[in-house]
């Protein structure tokens, strides 16, 4: 029973972490995010051409399923900075246009497993993944000099194949010639793995870095 349950949870974690790897999500309930703290540099005009530098994220999620009458919950925490980053982004007055954006992730996920609210296992699980280069166009509206709301994927299409929805709040700041897009987003969605239904609740604190040409 212990081995079978652990294998089920590991398969759930792998699938759901793939969904987490994006800053934007297809979810049943997305709070829209609050963004970061922003900066003091002038972000009133961000139009231009950029290279994708990387994306850093802290993710937390809780997946709960009912396995043969036992409530099983996996709580995962991960931190990563993307590698092998490729692609460009063009920002217009109301669009984010990405071309051939891609990256890889190589990190460790901490997983705490609970059975009927009793800690069953605490493990560090290696996770690697690659998002092949892809192109997309997202729209945005300006909220203030350092804040926008984006609808659609921010740069990279969701590797799970699900169409992102949004909207997501984004705070803007500069670090030299690099534009920082900061997102704090909470989400809830129904999930299924191997025919077992469940609920996933999570949050992402991420920063997308774009270097201006």
Stretch-by-stretch model annotation:
Residues 65-76:
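Acidic, glycine-anchored loop motifs typical of Ca2+
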């Amino acid at each position: 029973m212990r081995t079978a349950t652990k294998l089920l949870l590991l398969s759930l974690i792998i699938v759901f972490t793939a969904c987490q790897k994006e800053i934007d999500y297809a979810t049943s309930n997305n709070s829209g995010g609050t963004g970061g703290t922003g900066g003091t540099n002038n972000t009133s005009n961000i139009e231009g051409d950029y290279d994708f530098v990387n994306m850093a994220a802290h993710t937390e999620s809780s997946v709960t399923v009912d396995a043969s009458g036992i409530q099983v919950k996996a709580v995962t925490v991960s931190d990563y900075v993307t590698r092998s980053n490729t692609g460009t982004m063009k920002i217009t007055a109301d669009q984010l246009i990405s071309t051939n954006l891609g990256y890889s992730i190589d990190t460790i996920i901490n997983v705490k497993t609970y059975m009927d609210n009793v800690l069953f296992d605490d493990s560090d699980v290696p996770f690697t993944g690659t998002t092949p280069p892809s192109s997309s166009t997202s729209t945005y509206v300006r909220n203030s000099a350092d804040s926008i709301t984006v609808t659609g994927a921010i740069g990279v299409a969701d590797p799970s194949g699900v169409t992102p929805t949004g909207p997501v709040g984004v705070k803007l700041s500069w670090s030299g010639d690099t534009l920082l897009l900061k997102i704090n987003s909470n989400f809830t969605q129904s999930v299924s793995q191997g025919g077992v239904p469940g609920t996933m609740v999570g949050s992402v604190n991420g920063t997308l870095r774009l270097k201006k040409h």
